[in-house]
Amino acid sequence: RSDEDKDLMSALYQFGYKSAGFISGFIALLVAARAGWTATFLMVAFVLALSMIGSIIAPEPASSKTPNADRLSFLASLPRRVSTPAVTVVAIGWLIGFVMILVFVMQSLFSATPPSGGTFVRSEGPWIVGLTVLVPAIVSAILVFQFGAKADETPARIANETRAESVLRNLFRAIFDPLMELISRLKWGAVLVLLLALTYRFTDAVWGAFAYPFYLGDQFGALGHSLDDVAIASKFFGVVATILGSLLGAVLIAVLGRMPVFFVGGIVAAATNLLYADLAAGATVLDGFLHISHLGPPLSALADWAAKLSPDVVAADQGQRMARLMVTIFAENIAGGFALVAITAYLTSVVNPRFAAVQYALLASLTMLIGTLGRPWLGEIIESQGYYTVFMITFWLGGVAVVLSILEWVRQARDTS
């Protein structure tokens, strides 16, 4: 594909992604407040059906590569007595991690006394991360540094290959080739890359599961807003803010460079948790900001106008409450869009074009792992200590990514000097 095609496809993807956010968020919440969730899910299902039909009838893109095109791989440089045990160990580790998660899910669904999510994260969480991330990375490092594995051009398909050999080769290429290339190229810098992939979007990964309960609930310091409130503040202003944050991040990367923006993205992503903590604690700081900035009156007037369209009964202080929510969500989504562009640019920069698809998919999937595993633990803290405590915890945990981004910035500066 030409650069023009790639730019067009990227623009179409962003347009579709943001449009989906409006439909599944802003429009869906408005419909739910008026027609109920059944009608809302039917509407979303219809839109998804259109997407499925489009995917089915869309023509396959023409590929410039033949099915048997050569591919860079480390497998040929290793004896079978080394590669087979390596693949077996990692495959067993992934299987054990999957079974641990599956057992917890099944017990949560069907057990008379569901297991504690916090206990699961504290006891099994480190094992899952170790088996699925650390073990493959350590084995890859051993193959590179101890056995001297080198990347060579090998055919994508090998004639007269047995099924066992085919499975071994495909697993090796999917698991080890991307990691071994990173490790052989970056050396110890690969540790920083993996740690950043695991921690940079921790707050985003955690927050998604608790957003609606915090906005709509009335316990543990939740805000008790209506569906219309959330539709306007989160799914309209929030989406607009995400677009603006992404644009700001892209512009600053072009002006300042990748690593300064990456560092700042980690700071703002963590800092916006303090806004939510203040919101959960009564919004003293936010009220002061609205007063000093004179944003309170216009935002309150907008909220009062929107309240007239809502089928729900609104509180007397609806304008002030919505002003707080809109400012907080706008700031958080600006930071989220900014950080998303930063981490995307960073991950794109560290992958090898020959392994780009697999390496980027691997690193991008790691960005949500720690946050996903941390949700049950933080959910229990919400029930015992409230949302304020959780937002303070996520703020401090976000600082880990900030420290790691500084170390990575220094590493890259030394490598280029």
Segments from the language model and where they lie:
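A late C-terminal transmembrane helix in Major Facilitator Superfamily
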Residues: V350-E383
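Small-residue (Gly/Pro/Ala) motifs that create kinks and tight helix-helix packing interfaces
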Residues: A20-A32, Y212, G249, G374-I382
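Loop-to-transmembrane helix entry/capping segments in MFS-fold secondary transporters
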Residues: D3-L12, L227-D229, M322, P353-L363
